[in-house]
């Protein structure tokens, strides 16, 4: 196996923390703030680009629920972060003409947290729970009768004076979102009438998403420029919008807001060390360590973690999934192995200003 020299330093200060990566699909603090110009979320089926099979399934269920004038079945959406699970829940609410209340499982620590939410629901409303795999056991048990029989059972009093009080709830729809469906307990998972996966987006769909966001930003983007961002965003709309913001910053400083072309996009993303395959410095550091130090592998995850100064779980959940997805990495019984495709890509990039 040919070797690509990286100038790798064992004690490099580079860090793979999710909080600092431009290509991290989890929402950043910037994206958590609602600002007028950054309200990029679609509000209806027509505005939601991609996921055509999912939209067809949910669209039929929505029309059926509306025709019967009843609540939609409980919905479980799963898939990698950044693909639009929260957005889909909001679109469902708009299409049904009801309010969508949003919370996350970690926020429902105490029984009164989930009870308060359930008691305040109006008929046919949506309750969206993000990271539902992180629900506590107590919260889950409170949800079981609420999901199945639309009631909650409260225990009043203590000891011999304790008694159970049954409170009826209006019919509602729980929309759960998770990146780890296997971590959801079977009793909870079985109570969802509709379970659907969100898949990574195609380049053409991402280009349409980017062009729509550029219009909302008041940015004039050529077709080639949109495609260039789409190729580097890992099939994830959240990353696409984040890269577009960085391109907009660069165009603002360069006074080229009137027309953003492919050349400007390339300069901007090269500045952020995002290459044409969507790899960033952390990805390349991971790959180049295996190549330079272990001749392409195999190498164990714990060895990689120790050498890179990261936790094994961080590498496994943050860096490896995309490299596996694009065929740059293989997991074997003996450890991680670099593929020929990864080697060819790194060889082609070795003279690029991205590789420093």
UniProtKB/Swiss-Prot annotation:
Binding-site list for DNA: 331, 336
An example Gene Ontology molecular-function term: four-way junction DNA binding
Annotated Mg(2+) binding sites: 86
rRNA-binding found in the keyword field: no
Catalytic activity entry: ATP + H2O = ADP + phosphate + H(+)
NCBIfam families, per database record: PRK00080.1 (NF000868), ruvB (TIGR00635)
Segments for region (Head domain (RuvB-H)): 276-356
Domain notes: Has 3 domains, the large (RuvB-L) and small ATPase (RuvB-S) domains and the C-terminal head (RuvB-H) domain. The head domain binds DNA, while the ATPase domains jointly bind ATP, ADP or are empty depending on the state of the subunit in the translocation cycle. During a single DNA translocation step the structure of each domain remains the same, but their relative positions change.
HAMAP family, sorted: DNA_HJ_migration_RuvB (MF_00016)
Keyword terms: ATP-binding, Cytoplasm, DNA damage, DNA recombination, DNA repair, DNA-binding, Hydrolase, Nucleotide-binding
InterPro entries: AAA+_ATPase, AAA_lid_4, DNA_helicase_Holl-junc_RuvB, P-loop_NTPase, RuvB-like_N, RuvB_C, WH-like_DNA-bd_sf, WH_DNA-bd_sf
Highest taxon, organism lineage: Bacteria
Family: Belongs to the RuvB family.
Location(s), subcellular: Cytoplasm
Region of interest (Large ATPase domain (RuvB-L)), residue spans: 13-201
Protein name per Swiss-Prot or TrEMBL: Holliday junction branch migration complex subunit RuvB
GO cellular component labels: cytoplasm; Holliday junction resolvase complex
Chain positions recorded as ATP binding sites: 40-41, 82, 85-87, 148-150, 191, 201, 238
Native organism: Prochlorococcus marinus (strain SARG / CCMP1375 / SS120)
Enzyme class: hydrolase
GO BP terms in the entry: DNA recombination; DNA repair
Disulfide bonds: none
Stretches for region Small ATPAse domain (RuvB-S): 202-273
